Amino acid sequence: MNLLDYLPGVPDFPKPGVLFRDISPLLANPIAFKEAIHQLNEVAKQFDYTHILGIESRGFIFGSALAHFAHKGLALARKPNKLPLATHREAYGLEYGIDSLEIQQSTLPNDAKILLLDDVLATDGTLIAADKLIRSAGFEVIGAITLLEIGFLNGKQLLEQNGIRHQSVLKS
């Protein structure tokens, strides 16, 4: 099964010049979704981790399914002001402004070894911010995985320059 068949490109979304990969068809097909989680698990086996950090919002979908499948814990990296208790926060730049990620301070055990998970690796400020967030909170980041890597944007090289080991299921 070619999972890329279930990730159609939508040109000029959310802005001109961007080719957005829509995960909706993959999620709507139970066989394709199950295969995606199976393949993410195979990639994740390369890392010695105790918890997955799912990055808002599509990282929640894949992270929760993978955590269940792999019998691992799950923590959520949320946009600001979405968590009820005290948080750690990391700001990061986007091509059109600044955003932040937060994790609740009481979520993870002290010895947690974190595997970052997002759906797509693009440039990738989000995964770098998640890495900084987790490290500044005092936890160990083991690496990062994504379902899809958009190769020409060189996100993997940026992750490596920041000391983050990355693997993906698919590359386009």
From Swiss-Prot:
GO cellular component: cytoplasm
Pathway where this protein functions: Purine metabolism; AMP biosynthesis via salvage pathway; AMP from adenine: step 1/1
Keyword match Transferase: yes
UniProt main location, coarse: cytoplasm
Pfam families associated with the record: Pribosyltran (PF00156)
Annotated GO biological process: adenine salvage; AMP salvage; purine ribonucleoside salvage
Protein name (database record): Adenine phosphoribosyltransferase
UniProt source species: Polynucleobacter necessarius subsp. necessarius (strain STIR1)
